[in-house]
């Protein structure tokens, strides 16, 4: 397990810019969990969802920053590496606007 400092406002109000979050490597992510990901050369803290076709959705919790959402199609060949689950008091709801 480890801690990481979050930069940016895309995860507010659940995770504030500059705050430190704790990450569990042992917990597998399920839809709606928040994780730390390495995608296309960038580290990201995002909410995770995967559909039945294997497409991965990485959401910003701050819906004013939905421009930072990512969709990684299963057929894209892009590797999404998850370093672990961010430990939050409760699981945030998945966005309704995707």
What role is predicted for each listed range?
Residues 1-98:
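Acidic/glycine-rich C-terminal interaction modules and beta/coil loop segments
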